[in-house]
Amino acid sequence: MSLSRVSVTGVRNLHPVTLSPSPRINILYGANGSGKTSVLEAIHLLGIARSFRSSRLLPVIQYVQPSCTVFGQVDLAQGGHSNLGVSRDRQGEFQIRIDGQNARSAAQLAEILPLQLINPDSFRLLEGAPKIRRQFLDWGVFHVEPRFMVTWQRLQKALKQRNSWLRHGTLDAASQAAWDRELCYASDEIDEFRRAYIKALKPVFEQTLSELVELEGLTLSYYRGWDKEKELSTVLASSLHRDQQMGHTQAGPQRADLRLRLGAHNAADILSRGQQKLVVCALRIAQGHLVSQVRRGQCIYLVDDLPSELDDNHRRALCRLLEELRCQVFITCVDQEFLREGWQTETPVALFHVEQGRITQTHDHRE
């Protein structure tokens, strides 16, 4: 799948524009602050209904505009296309449209337009809180396991009920037991989905990493959020008093984590920023491989500031892997000379110059 058309209005400093990107490689180049990252942000908004630069959408709206809007036409892997649209105004109204109909949730966007982001903050996947790694893990599970979303919603509902009575004691014993059973059932299913996903991801990740950098002894493991030797029901019963003191459930899939270690050490503690970025790139490219195997369609990669913290050899290796995925890629850089060359002759490459929010296509992939 790929975006064949993108229209952007009212996003940051960007002038209104309609782009016809290449189905493969798209390079956006220009000076820092010109608006390159805002193009990626607009595509991210279209696919996830969130910005990767701000937790709020109000700053995304151009200061002279009442709202921001992004439309896109997605060419589907199975044939045909789907039209997506998102808009957000200054009063907080947010609208998602899919093929002319209002969508129920952002998950519907994500299902049609799976996106992967690689940017200067990527190292947070290793250094950041477990929540970031759970989001990475569950993105992958969501795209390969059709039952995940329904089970996830059941888990969240049961967890919310249990945490509420832990804080307020509002449920009788029978209701407490019923919600505990529901929580344990949903937790076991989520754990099963995640374990199966990690089992499939690990060999692909290891192979991908070996093509980017040699890090002998790096291991990827999964912690499910409670003792692997015990049933969750047993753990919940034994920790009930402390859970009541804390006001929330301390064990379960909401505490899961991915652990990357180099020998006996946490990988984030001893890898350089450049090495961390390569590890994260390998993880995200491995996810793309799994999506293509299961869905017959590729995810789209948004790569912001590719040269950052990577030398020429590693940049070339990363570009080669992205090209081999045969997916659509949007890459930003200051100087396009390095990225303009080196692609296979049959790979369609489009170049876009971004200057003070204006975007000009300088090389058409159809030429």
Swiss-Prot record:
It holds the Pfam family SMC_N. Keywords: ATP-binding, Cytoplasm, DNA damage, DNA repair, DNA replication, DNA-binding, Nucleotide-binding, SOS response. One of its GO terms (biological process) is DNA replication. GO terms for cellular component: cytoplasm. This is DNA replication and repair protein RecF. The lineage of its organism: Bacteria, Pseudomonadati, Pseudomonadota, Gammaproteobacteria, Pseudomonadales. The gene is recF. The RecF protein is involved in DNA metabolism; it is required for DNA replication and normal SOS inducibility. RecF binds preferentially to single-stranded, linear DNA. It also seems to bind ATP. Belongs to the RecF family. It is found in: Cytoplasm. ATP binds at G30, A31, N32, G33, S34, G35, K36, T37. The keyword Ion transport does not apply. GO terms for molecular function: ATP binding; single-stranded DNA binding.
